[in-house]
Amino acid sequence: MSHDLDLWSSPSTPQRLWSVRKRDRELAAELLTLGEYGCEIQLFRDRGFYSSKRFETVDRALRSAERIVRALQAEGWTRST
């Protein structure tokens, strides 16, 4: 017997893209794929949720995350992963 709940798909497990440190602060980015709804970049500050943005494609999300980390590195943040 099929249930309506069987049709519900949950997001994938987030994939860590990078983390950066500056003094005692940490910022991290994760990629969350949402199936037919695209994907999302989630930012965490000191291990707490900070912000997210949804994208139509993984490629666009990855390019955005790379721009963010490059800008942070230009401001003195050090990449740790």
Where are these regions (language model features)?
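Short arginine-rich
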Residues: 66-79
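Short aromatic-glycine-(Arg/Gly/Cys) micro-motifs in beta-strand/loop hairpins
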Residues: 26-50
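Negatively charged, low-complexity tracts enriched in Asp/Glu with abundant Ser/Thr
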Residues: 1-26, 46-51, 56-58, 62-63, ...
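Short, surface-exposed linear segments at secondary-structure transitions and domain or protein termini
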Residues: 37-40, 59-68
